[in-house]
Amino acid sequence: MLLAALGCTAAYSQAIGDHNYLGQELNTITTAVPFLQVAPDSRSGAMGDMGVATSADVNSQHHNPSKYVFNKNIFGVSISYSPWLRKLVNDINLLYLSAYWKITDYDALSFSLRYFSLGDIQFTDMYGQPMGTQKPNEFAIDLGYSRKLIDQLSIAITPRFIYSNLTAGQIVDNEPTNAGLAGAADVSMFYEQDFALGKSNMNSTLRAGFNISNIGNKISYSSGTLHRDFLPTNLKLGVSYAIDFNEHHTLMAGVEINKLLVPTPPEYLVNDSTGRIEYDAANNPIIKYGKNPDVSVAQGIFQSFNDAPGGAAEEFREVNWSVGLEYSYRNLLFVRAGYFFEHPTKGNRQFITVGAGIHYSIFGLDMAYLFTVDQHHPLENTLRFTLTFDFASFKKDDIRNQGKVQMN
């Protein structure tokens, strides 16, 4: 049976064309539930998906929940919508709801709900006969707690529940399938320091952050199989710098790198005469280069830094990077741009992003637009929209120093 749903979820994380790129073999890392990797909000989406070290906002939950305690307001909520992969089909959608509440000036709680609908999928059997139409979907719910350690540094922990229903209970190889369930967590840190710039006394802010996301159990879609897939455990590192030229004009620039912390597929030994993979006495495929990917989650995280069959050169190709700019006028009007790069042998996502936003009082509306370097890429012309409500509190001054740990 052709599980079209599985193909759709992989499509936005891969763009596989020829078998090699400039003599380098394609070796894309695949995981379950790749929808967790998609930047859902318009602000980040307009800056090359960069967000781990930008200023705090309502949508920090996806990028770096540690930022929430640096929000100037007390409570905020936002909803984001993106029609996804419109170059392929017209009914795949991503919805994202996020919110935060600053308990004190040193503590914050946060929440997000991410829902990914794959639209109508026509299932067929191994002979191509229709087996009905279903609407596969996935969602993730998470709660976060962030805490300032000192005035400039914060940390956060974010547990997550993941539900992935791709097969809608269809029978595959005479075996019933079920929805995949998983639990995961993010661990993050954020640094923010204000200072005067030179003799001009212009205000500026340096920010840095990291986030290790989706640390959790492997996921399976059948109770009768031993095969389980890794979650997209990912490491993000970033830094940004903002300058307030005066009370009206601010410019922020940043750079971010990220890497999947899951095993890289090895290169197996192939028989030259038959073209088939060779197996050992225990009926395991013989690895020619690289390492065995069938390991625990913890081992997979550490192994991911030195298991690529192409050695150090391939490890560096597994690092994606993005750059972004944001200009704001009186924190009212925003213009943004960015660029994201993923090596052609590792998925080939390369795109330019632009966007704009308007924020007035408690309301904010942002949008982002994506241009891909490859005009035939399924991500081409992707749009994102975000509506934000960010509230100051009448009791803001009352909580300003609550929660602070007194140091002797």
Please give the residue ranges for each predicted region.
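Sec-dependent N-terminal signal peptides
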Residues: 1-7
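Sec/Tat signal peptide C-region and signal peptidase I cleavage site
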Residues: 8-13
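Subset of outer-membrane beta-barrel
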Residues: 14-408
